Structures are given as structure tokens and as C-alpha cells.
Amino acid sequence: MNLPRLTMVGNLQVVIENHRGIVEYSPKRVVVAFNQGRLVLEGEDLVIGTIQAEEIAITGKVQSLFFGLEQGRE
């Protein structure tokens, strides 16, 4: 299965596996694409620490996290 996997360390770091790229980035908002939809992280001082083909690590003060499925892709 190629499902997204998220690992959080408190609200200070999120490691995202099985992504399809970054759609939007700012220090207050990061949008990451998946096969099934998108993940939206909002917070303060968000920084992409590492980005690899299958994994992204984002640090900062994460205040909210939303996972949205695209219709017809459940």
C-alpha cells in the first residue's frame, strides 16, 4: 500500500512519508500532495528541514493539520 504515513514529535516536527510533492509553502502554511488528496499544515515558523523522494520533514510550531481526500479517490 502506498498510503501516507505521518509521524509527529509534539507540535514541533512532522515527518511525512509517501508524498507526491509540495503544492504550497510559506512559513505559515505547507500543503503536501498524496495519491488520495492533500495534507495542509498551518502554524508558525514552518521550515522544510529535509525533502527526499519519499519523505519530507517539516519543523516549526504546528498549530493545525488537515487531511483532505479528493472525491473519487478514496
Regions found by a protein language model. Give the residues of each.
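N-terminal intrinsically disordered, cationic/polar leader segments
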Residues: 1-74
